Regions:
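Structured alpha/beta or helical-core interaction and ligand-binding surfaces enriched in interleaved
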Residues: 1-123, 128-131
Length: 131
């Protein structure tokens, strides 16, 4: 299973998984899915951890993710077409994403640990499953 599919299976609300699975695998439909990330409401709230208010900079977010087991690199799913579908160092990816108001998911450990940033104010979460 590729990182995008694991995101769907593990962090999206069950009623949306099938629809997004179909979209994410087709180039034209994928673009529509990526545009929805800006104001995304389909993440399963059971696995969302809000970012602490004083931990809003890329290096601080990277530190939190690293303490939770994130490796040095991550997979990017983003409405920013220059980043989408790429793997890059975690801190570099966070520097490109944080504060840019582009819906983006960074997969650190597929199916277990990710980061989401949306366009709306305060829309920054760590996604974590420990099961």
């Amino acid at each position: 299973m590729v990182p995008d599919e694991q995101l769907l299976a593990r962090f999206f609300i069950p009623t949306k998984r099938e629809r997004y699975a179909e979209m994410i695998g087709h180039p034209k439909k994928r673009r529509k899915f990526l545009c929805e990330l800006a104001h995304f409401r389909s993440l399963d709230p059971r696995y969302l951890i809000p970012m602490p208010p004083k931990k809003l900079f890329p290096d601080q977010i990277a530190e939190i993710l690293t303490k939770k087991g994130a490796p040095r690199s991550c997979w990017i799913t983003s409405e920013n077409s220059e980043l989408d579908g790429k793997e890059m160092p975690l801190l570099e990816a966070l520097n490109e994403v944080v504060g840019r108001q582009m819906g983006t998911l960074l997969t650190c450990i597929p199916g277990r640990l990710a980061y989401f940033e949306g366009e709306d104010m305060g829309c920054r979460w760590i996604l974590e499953r420990r099961d």
